[in-house]
Amino acid sequence: MKMKKILKIQKNKIYFENDDEIIDISPEIKRQFALKAGDDITLKYNEICYEAAFIKGAFLLSLKDRTKKGLKNKLDEKFFNKNAVIKAVDKLERLGY
């Protein structure tokens, strides 16, 4: 896996060095993982993406009902980590969202 080092955190977004990826995170995720600029999150990347996808998925479902496929497609637009999206959608389905 390519090294994931945080360039900056602006509002609720993580920007990475040498990468086009931007992850939307909640303040809870920022606190939970003690994220700050300069951190190497390579080892925590999958877990952070999963948590962020789960929270974003729950938020999207609070706005309107979506099919499992529709929710997955929407999250795929926001997150590069496809495994995290699949896990998050499956958990939301198990929880009855």
Where are these regions (language model features)?
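An alpha-helical, amphipathic repeat domain used for nucleic-acid recognition
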Residues: 1-97
